[in-house]
Amino acid sequence: MAHLLSASCPSVISLSSSSSKNSVKPFVSGQTFFNAQLLSRSSLKGLLFQEKKPRKSCVFRATAVPITQQAPPETSTNNSSSKPKRVMVIGGDGYCGWATALHLSKKNYEVCIVDNLVRRLFDHQLGLESLTPIASIHDRISRWKALTGKSIELYVGDICDFEFLAESFKSFEPDSVVHFGEQRSAPYSMIDRSRAVYTQHNNVIGTLNVLFAIKEFGEECHLVKLGTMGEYGTPNIDIEEGYITITHNGRTDTLPYPKQASSFYHLSKVHDSHNIAFTCKAWGIRATDLNQGVVYGVKTDETEMHEELRNRLDYDAVFGTALNRFCVQAAVGHPLTVYGKGGQTRGYLDIRDTVQCVEIAIANPAKAGEFRVFNQFTEQFSVNELASLVTKAGSKLGLDVKKMTVPNPRVEAEEHYYNAKHTKLMELGLEPHYLSDSLLDSLLNFAVQFKDRVDTKQIMPSVSWKKIGVKTKSMTT
């Protein structure tokens, strides 16, 4: 199990048993402590274990191989003389979470990562692999320390285990929690019954535990929760930022904007939003829900500092996002896979803007009892528009880019009205990176650089919204 959770970590692992209550201690430039019990009683149980095994109290201690390179601490860009704010990044080993953790650390926040590393396990289970080779979380954090002098603490465990999460909260005492720690793929949630159940249990129960942890151990803590623009669906009216004012039968009220989720994943995000809104009202929690659009790109200033800091980039049909997938398809000469009519329109943003938006939300926290909703994207594109942009950019690089129409595996409108508001983050200072020719060139060149790592069998969609069933499905057969 430890091997699965940190498959690429060059570490020394020892196992000790104890009848006493396990304590949670952070990784700080060299050590990790995580509780194996939490995995056996969490939502990971069905994914990790093929048969029931006796439970025992144990603690894994993994000591990362030390890195000798050391740099002096970087001068802070934060002019405040007060104690640096402490930010817990849940899901900090993932695509958006890793980039965010590094960005906040560089900005002089005290950062810890909480992660069960299950995203890496999904790759093992489904036969998938990031386009980019990624280092273990232990090597990543050690390299960051060596290059910048800044420490990132690491708590390896499952937030669906409240005891683990509570101990992490009490140990780190965060001022803000950035919550990326959810199963984030709509196709994954539609593979079969077990993945649908896992997605909803992991996401909804995990977020509930975070809310209870804030209530019990950090009532002033600000929750920055990553939601999704997919909560709204594709209504035939403008999409507002979280709330809409309605006049009905002569009476007017401002209400939460209607939700029309299109997968079990998106539904889990809707449930999260309702639970967070309720606890803000009932308990006075302060929360910001960032309804994020589709993220593209892989490079940030921090992840480009060293190859061991490199972020993952998914190109497969389960975890890959549209623009990233198209660029990889173009790089290997595979026709761009346009689902259905290709008129599906969504909000998009560069990963550099993801980290910027999170920083803005932390620096401008919600008030006590306030449930604040920001729509987090910078531009809108249809699938056909993205395909045209990639085709044009690819031709400049000498790539022969073609397009193919694929029967849509999803249940969604393929031609529709779409106009979503996204002004609140701009008003707070977001400086967006718009999709430009130079950015597309960079992303395409990056895909070409690693094209030998592409498994073309993973490009075509194999998950159907209508064919989901009870039987557990293997993606490798």
Swiss-Prot record:
Enzyme class: hydrolase
Cellular component aspect of the GO annotation: chloroplast; plasma membrane
Induction remark: Induced in response to altered availability of inorganic phosphate.
Presequence range in chain numbering: 1-86
Positions annotated to bind NAD(+): 95-96, 115-119, 158-159, 184, 202, 265, 269, 295
Main location: plastid
EC numbers for this chain: 3.13.1.1
Location of region: Disordered: 1-21
Residues of the active site: 228, 265 (proton acceptor), 269
Swiss-Prot/TrEMBL catalytic activity: sulfite + UDP-alpha-D-glucose + H(+) = UDP-alpha-D-6-sulfoquinovose + H2O
One Pfam match: Epimerase
pH sensitivity of activity: Optimum pH is 7.5-9.5.
InterPro entries: Epimerase_deHydtase (IPR001509), NAD(P)-bd_dom_sf (IPR036291)
GO BP annotations, alphabetical order: cellular response to phosphate starvation; glycolipid biosynthetic process
Summary of activators and inhibitors of this protein: Concentrations above 100 uM sulfite inhibit the reaction.
Gene3D superfamilies: NAD(P)-binding Rossmann-like Domain (3.40.50.720), UDP-galactose 4-epimerase, domain 1 (3.90.25.10)
Listed cofactors: NAD(+)
Protein residues bound to substrate: 184, 228, 265, 292, 322-325, 337-339, 410-412
Superkingdom of this protein's organism: Eukaryota
Subcellular location field: Plastid, Chloroplast
MF terms in GO: sulfotransferase activity; UDPsulfoquinovose synthase activity; zinc ion binding
Family from the record: Belongs to the NAD(P)-dependent epimerase/dehydratase family.
Subunit organization: Homodimer.
Free-text function comment from the UniProt entry: Involved in the biosynthesis of sulfolipids found in thylakoid membranes. Converts UDP-glucose and sulfite to the sulfolipid head group precursor UDP-sulfoquinovose.
Protein name: UDP-sulfoquinovose synthase, chloroplastic
Gene responsible for this protein: SQD1
